[in-house]
Amino acid sequence: MARLHERGLLHRLADGYYVVVPQDMTGSSWMPGLETAAAGIASAIYGPDNILVMGVSAARLHGAIPRALATATVAVPAQHRPIALSDRAAVVRFVKRNTQGLDAERYDTELGSTLVTTPEQTILDLAHRPDLGDAEVDVPTAVAALYERSDKDRLQALATEQRRIASLRRAETWARQ
Protein backbone atom coordinates (compact mmCIF):
# COMPACT_ATOMS: atom_id res chain seq x y z
CA MET A 1 0.00 0.00 0.00
CA ALA A 2 2.77 2.42 0.88
CA ARG A 3 4.34 1.93 -2.53
CA LEU A 4 1.02 2.57 -4.34
CA HIS A 5 0.53 5.68 -2.21
CA GLU A 6 4.04 6.93 -3.03
CA ARG A 7 3.39 6.39 -6.75
CA GLY A 8 0.21 8.50 -6.53
CA LEU A 9 -2.16 5.61 -7.25
CA LEU A 10 -3.72 5.61 -3.78
CA HIS A 11 -4.79 8.57 -1.67
CA ARG A 12 -4.59 8.18 2.12
CA LEU A 13 -7.73 9.47 3.85
CA ALA A 14 -6.94 8.39 7.43
CA ASP A 15 -4.96 5.72 9.24
CA GLY A 16 -5.87 2.49 7.45
CA TYR A 17 -8.20 4.09 4.88
CA TYR A 18 -7.14 4.66 1.29
CA VAL A 19 -8.97 5.36 -1.97
CA VAL A 20 -7.86 4.72 -5.53
CA VAL A 21 -6.98 7.96 -7.31
CA PRO A 22 -9.03 8.36 -10.52
CA GLN A 23 -6.86 7.51 -13.51
CA ASP A 24 -7.02 11.00 -15.03
CA MET A 25 -5.89 12.51 -11.69
CA THR A 26 -2.89 10.24 -11.07
CA GLY A 27 0.17 12.24 -10.13
CA SER A 28 -1.81 15.32 -9.11
CA SER A 29 -2.68 16.56 -5.63
CA TRP A 30 -6.23 15.19 -5.98
CA MET A 31 -8.33 14.36 -2.96
CA PRO A 32 -12.02 13.46 -2.81
CA GLY A 33 -14.60 15.79 -1.30
CA LEU A 34 -15.19 15.39 2.43
CA GLU A 35 -18.65 13.85 2.00
CA THR A 36 -17.31 11.37 -0.55
CA ALA A 37 -14.40 10.47 1.73
CA ALA A 38 -16.78 9.97 4.66
CA ALA A 39 -19.03 7.70 2.59
CA GLY A 40 -16.00 5.68 1.51
CA ILE A 41 -14.72 5.20 5.04
CA ALA A 42 -18.17 4.29 6.38
CA SER A 43 -18.71 1.86 3.48
CA ALA A 44 -15.40 0.17 4.25
CA ILE A 45 -16.52 -0.36 7.85
CA TYR A 46 -20.23 -1.24 7.44
CA GLY A 47 -20.75 -2.02 3.74
CA PRO A 48 -22.12 0.36 1.10
CA ASP A 49 -25.79 -0.53 1.61
CA ASN A 50 -25.69 0.02 5.38
CA ILE A 51 -24.58 3.67 5.49
CA LEU A 52 -26.21 6.96 4.54
CA VAL A 53 -24.64 10.36 4.23
CA MET A 54 -26.90 12.52 6.42
CA GLY A 55 -27.37 15.89 8.10
CA VAL A 56 -25.16 18.76 6.98
CA SER A 57 -23.22 16.39 4.71
CA ALA A 58 -26.40 15.41 2.86
CA ALA A 59 -27.35 19.10 2.67
CA ARG A 60 -23.95 19.78 1.04
CA LEU A 61 -24.51 17.04 -1.54
CA HIS A 62 -28.00 18.42 -2.23
CA GLY A 63 -26.45 21.87 -2.81
CA ALA A 64 -28.08 23.52 0.22
CA ILE A 65 -24.80 24.36 1.99
CA PRO A 66 -22.29 25.85 -0.44
CA ARG A 67 -19.24 26.22 1.79
CA ALA A 68 -16.90 23.38 2.63
CA LEU A 69 -17.26 21.95 6.13
CA ALA A 70 -14.82 20.33 8.53
CA THR A 71 -17.21 17.64 9.80
CA ALA A 72 -19.00 14.95 7.83
CA THR A 73 -21.91 12.99 9.31
CA VAL A 74 -22.85 9.47 8.28
CA ALA A 75 -25.72 7.32 9.57
CA VAL A 76 -24.51 3.81 10.44
CA PRO A 77 -26.07 0.72 12.07
CA ALA A 78 -23.64 0.60 15.03
CA GLN A 79 -21.73 3.29 16.88
CA HIS A 80 -18.14 4.02 15.87
CA ARG A 81 -15.64 6.53 17.18
CA PRO A 82 -15.07 9.64 15.05
CA ILE A 83 -12.25 9.32 12.53
CA ALA A 84 -9.91 12.26 11.96
CA LEU A 85 -8.77 12.54 8.37
CA SER A 86 -5.06 12.74 7.69
CA ASP A 87 -5.32 14.59 4.36
CA ARG A 88 -7.12 17.67 5.77
CA ALA A 89 -8.34 19.18 9.03
CA ALA A 90 -11.65 17.32 9.09
CA VAL A 91 -13.45 14.56 10.96
CA VAL A 92 -16.02 11.91 10.07
CA ARG A 93 -18.74 11.49 12.72
CA PHE A 94 -20.81 8.32 12.81
CA VAL A 95 -24.41 8.47 14.05
CA LYS A 96 -26.02 5.19 15.09
CA ARG A 97 -29.43 4.96 13.40
CA ASN A 98 -31.78 2.45 11.85
CA THR A 99 -30.35 3.03 8.37
CA GLN A 100 -32.97 0.80 6.75
CA GLY A 101 -35.73 3.03 8.15
CA LEU A 102 -34.42 6.28 6.69
CA ASP A 103 -35.59 7.79 3.41
CA ALA A 104 -32.61 7.61 1.05
CA GLU A 105 -31.59 7.87 -2.57
CA ARG A 106 -28.52 6.89 -4.57
CA TYR A 107 -26.05 9.68 -5.25
CA ASP A 108 -23.13 9.45 -7.68
CA THR A 109 -19.80 10.63 -6.30
CA GLU A 110 -16.36 10.76 -7.85
CA LEU A 111 -15.67 7.36 -6.25
CA GLY A 112 -18.96 5.64 -7.11
CA SER A 113 -22.50 5.79 -5.83
CA THR A 114 -23.54 6.05 -2.20
CA LEU A 115 -26.76 6.39 -0.26
CA VAL A 116 -27.75 9.89 0.86
CA THR A 117 -30.81 10.94 2.83
CA THR A 118 -33.45 12.50 0.58
CA PRO A 119 -34.06 16.25 0.85
CA GLU A 120 -37.15 15.52 2.97
CA GLN A 121 -35.26 13.24 5.38
CA THR A 122 -32.41 15.74 5.49
CA ILE A 123 -34.82 18.53 6.49
CA LEU A 124 -36.11 16.47 9.42
CA ASP A 125 -32.60 15.44 10.49
CA LEU A 126 -31.29 19.01 10.40
CA ALA A 127 -34.29 20.42 12.26
CA HIS A 128 -34.11 17.64 14.87
CA ARG A 129 -30.38 18.04 15.60
CA PRO A 130 -29.19 21.37 14.15
CA ASP A 131 -25.88 21.23 16.05
CA LEU A 132 -24.85 17.83 14.68
CA GLY A 133 -22.01 18.43 12.26
CA ASP A 134 -20.75 21.68 13.74
CA ALA A 135 -22.50 23.90 11.17
CA GLU A 136 -25.54 25.10 13.10
CA VAL A 137 -25.16 28.61 11.65
CA ASP A 138 -25.88 27.16 8.18
CA VAL A 139 -28.77 24.90 9.14
CA PRO A 140 -31.78 27.29 8.97
CA THR A 141 -30.77 28.51 5.49
CA ALA A 142 -30.10 24.95 4.31
CA VAL A 143 -33.46 23.76 5.64
CA ALA A 144 -35.23 26.66 3.90
CA ALA A 145 -33.51 25.83 0.59
CA LEU A 146 -34.36 22.13 0.85
CA TYR A 147 -37.92 22.85 2.00
CA GLU A 148 -38.59 24.97 -1.07
CA ARG A 149 -37.98 22.03 -3.40
CA SER A 150 -39.25 19.21 -1.19
CA ASP A 151 -42.37 17.09 -1.58
CA LYS A 152 -44.52 18.46 1.26
CA ASP A 153 -46.76 15.36 1.41
CA ARG A 154 -43.71 13.10 1.67
CA LEU A 155 -42.21 15.39 4.31
CA GLN A 156 -45.40 15.24 6.41
CA ALA A 157 -45.59 11.44 6.05
CA LEU A 158 -41.95 11.00 7.13
CA ALA A 159 -42.41 13.35 10.09
CA THR A 160 -45.45 11.36 11.20
CA GLU A 161 -43.77 7.95 10.71
CA GLN A 162 -40.61 9.01 12.52
CA ARG A 163 -42.34 11.05 15.24
CA ARG A 164 -40.60 14.21 14.09
CA ILE A 165 -43.59 16.57 13.96
CA ALA A 166 -41.81 19.11 16.22
CA SER A 167 -38.82 19.00 13.85
CA LEU A 168 -41.13 19.58 10.89
CA ARG A 169 -42.67 22.61 12.63
CA ARG A 170 -39.18 24.03 13.31
CA ALA A 171 -38.27 23.49 9.64
CA GLU A 172 -41.46 25.21 8.51
CA THR A 173 -40.63 28.19 10.73
CA TRP A 174 -37.14 28.44 9.22
CA ALA A 175 -38.60 28.15 5.71
CA ARG A 176 -40.94 31.11 6.35
CA GLN A 177 -38.16 33.42 7.59
Locate predicted features.
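Exposed, interaction-prone assembly regions rather than primary DNA-binding/catalytic cores
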Residues: 50-102
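A generic structural signal for short, non-catalytic loop/turn and secondary-structure boundary residues
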Residues: 10-11, 67-69, 85-88, 109, ...
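A conserved hydrophobic position in a structured secondary element of the catalytic/binding core
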Residues: 13, 53-54, 118
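Hydrophobic alpha-helical interaction segments
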Residues: 101-177
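Short beta-edge/loop segments at beta->alpha junctions of small alpha/beta modules
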Residues: 1-50, 147-171, 175
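N-proximal short alpha-helices
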Residues: 24-27, 31, 89-97, 112
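Residue-level detector of family-conserved "landmark" positions at structurally sensitive sites
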Residues: 14-15, 69, 137
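Hydrophobic/aromatic-lined pockets within catalytic cores
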Residues: 9, 63, 128-131
